[in-house]
Amino acid sequence: AGSYALTGSYPQVRAWQQATAQTPGLLARALDPQAQPLNEEEMARLALGLRTRLQNDAGNVEGWLMLGRTGMVLGNAGTATGAYANAYRLDPKNSDAALGYAEALTRSSDPEDNRRGGELLRRLVSRDHTDIRVLSLYAFSAFEQQRFDEAVAAWEMMLKLLPAGDARRAVIERSIRLAQEK
């Protein structure tokens, strides 16, 4: 038994137990804008703890959304895409789930994921063409896929929605010029 502790997977089990125990505190810090931001190791422990929780609470949309966000921050495309897919499947009308899933798909290295993400973004834009977050992601996705006319149309729609002094206007105007040159 003593040699198992040294050679077995006990250290991994202990790390998992610690991550699970720390999840509530890490989650509270992650959600508190006044708290010190989590470092990468803490984010990884939060992701492990969330995955563990979601094994027993698979219908928790907010938990899947948090795991998706954590996966994006950690650059773990598989975790992010899977978590957002679950959140979207559970609540397709949830705009955070839909937008998170679309973003994860459009950032994927798989062209089929990119296509599916673009389709989802087109549906989101047609559902609500006044959501700046959706329009922004749609425009950049269209630009990356060399659909420059669609990108320009989305950015022009954003310009109509943003107030005159908004700092984002200059970036959008530059993006429009760049797309028109292509």
Q: Residue spans of the language-model regions?
A:
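Alpha-solenoid helical repeat scaffolds
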Residues: 48-51, 85, 122, 156
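Structural marker of alpha-solenoid helical repeat scaffolds
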Residues: 56, 90, 127-128, 161, ...
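Register position in tetratricopeptide repeats
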Residues: 73, 107-110, 144, 178-182
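TPR/TPR-like (Sel1-like) alpha-helical repeat modules
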Residues: 143, 148-166, 174-177
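TPR/TPR-like alpha-solenoid repeats
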Residues: 70, 104, 141, 161, ...
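Long, contiguous interaction/recruitment modules in multidomain scaffold/adaptor proteins
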Residues: 1-48
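Alpha-helical adaptor scaffolds
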Residues: 30-39, 43, 61, 66-73, ...
